[in-house]
């Protein structure tokens, strides 16, 4: 499984509203409707069907205390290998359902734990979107994008996957940084 935190530039610009990212992540919806297929909605830890408006509202209003030029959210891409996709199911629908479950039970819990702040996936404000096509890549196409807030769901803690893991105590009981290498390899 390839897991990557996207940079904050171009379509993934993250210092303002997430509306452009939410809009971009819907690019497959019109194509799927034209083909007679159901668009894949946004999802989070608890729900399978979340409107783009709600995603934008929740992420954009979860930024208490962040500076103007500070990232407000991050975008994570999760892409399974061909073998992993086969294990997820025979149809695209089965694979999409398995991918959502994988994100809920593996990716986001490990992401939360990676901050060493006693967080769980339920503490995160995140929204995922399954995509079935990748026009610029060869090979298997199914992948997911996850928009995750820079702040925990209760606006209480600032968390960034871009901080470097130090393994040292910074203040109080919290350890500094986020160990991306350990998270990516799990």
Q: What residue spans do the PLM features occupy?
A:
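N-terminal nicking endonuclease/strand-transfer module with a His-rich metal-binding environment
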Residues: 1-186
């Amino acid at each position: 499984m390839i897991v990557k935190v996207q940079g904050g530039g171009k379509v993934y610009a993250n210092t303002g509203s997430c509306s452009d990212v939410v809009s971009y992540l819907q690019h497959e919806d019109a194509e799927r409707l034209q083909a007679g297929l159901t668009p894949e909605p946004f999802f989070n830890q608890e729900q399978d069907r979340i409107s783009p408006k709600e995603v934008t509202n929740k992420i954009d209003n979860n930024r208490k205390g962040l500076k103007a030029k500070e990232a407000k959210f991050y975008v994570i891409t999760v892409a399974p290998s061909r073998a992993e996709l086969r294990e997820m199911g025979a149809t695209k629908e089965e694979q999409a359902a398995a991918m959502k479950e994988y994100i809920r039970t593996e990716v986001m819990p490990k992401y939360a734990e990676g901050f060493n702040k006693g967080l769980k996936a339920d503490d995160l404000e995140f929204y995922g979107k399954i995509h079935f096509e990748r026009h610029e890549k060869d090979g298997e196409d199914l992948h997911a994008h996850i928009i995750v807030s820079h702040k925990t769901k209760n606006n209480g803690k600032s968390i960034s996957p871009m901080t470097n893991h130090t393994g040292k105590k910074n203040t109080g009981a919290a350890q500094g940084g986020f160990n991306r290498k350990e998270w990516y390899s799990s």
